[in-house]
């Protein structure tokens, strides 16, 4: 398995995985919109995507968005999306993607990474804790959905 940094030319490898990821969170299937969304993020340099590959087959991806910690005066990365194809689960793909994201944060001089996950997504929580992530017990999260 190889972890590569995705480029716009890789969009057709990522789109089916991204569509499946969205379906996991109960969004309707829409491969073309998924493809367009990923293409825009990559061509506009709005996100960084790492792709797990094996024999020209995409196994999973992690997508990071840049943010800033104002008080710390440093950058950080939002690990917004992590998905592994069902046929490739329990083979270390998710862990390899998490490690590559962490390595990238180090390479960019970032303060760190953060993520959020569904409270009932126990497999993901187990993976994050295995990779050394700590659940925040200090801060509340607030959302205001506009549309």
PLM regions with names:
Residues 2-16:
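A short beta-loop-alpha structural element at the N-terminal edge
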Residues 15-40:
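Conserved GNAT-fold acetyl-CoA-binding loop/helix
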Residues 39-51, 78:
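A short helix-loop-beta-strand connector motif used in the catalytic cores of GNAT acetyltransferases and
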Residues 51, 57-66:
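Conserved beta-strand in the GNAT
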Residues 75-86:
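Conserved acetyl-CoA binding element of GNAT-fold acetyltransferases
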Residues 84, 90-103, 130:
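Conserved acetyl-CoA-binding loop-helix of GNAT-fold acetyltransferases
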Residues 95, 119-137:
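Conserved active-site alpha-helix within GNAT-family acetyltransferase domains
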Residues 98, 106-116:
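Conserved GNAT acetyl-CoA-binding A-motif
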């Amino acid at each position: 398995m190889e972890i590569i940094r995705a480029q716009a030319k890789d969009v057709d490898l990522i789109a089916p995985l991204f569509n499946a990821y969205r379906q996991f969170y109960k969004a309707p299937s829409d491969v073309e919109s998924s493809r367009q969304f990923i293409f825009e993020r990559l061509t506009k340099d709005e996100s960084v995507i790492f792709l797990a590959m094996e024999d020209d087959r995409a196994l999973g991806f992690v997508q990071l968005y840049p943010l800033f910690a104002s008080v710390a005066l440093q950058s950080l990365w939002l690990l917004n999306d992590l998905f592994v194809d069902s046929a490739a689960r329990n083979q270390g793909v998710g862990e390899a993607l998490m490690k590559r994201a962490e390595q990238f944060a180090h390479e960019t001089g970032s303060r760190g990474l953060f993520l959020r996950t569904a409270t009932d997504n126990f497999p993901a929580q187990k993976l994050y804790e295995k990779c050394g992530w700590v659940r925040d017990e200090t801060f509340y999260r607030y959302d205001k959905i506009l549309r």
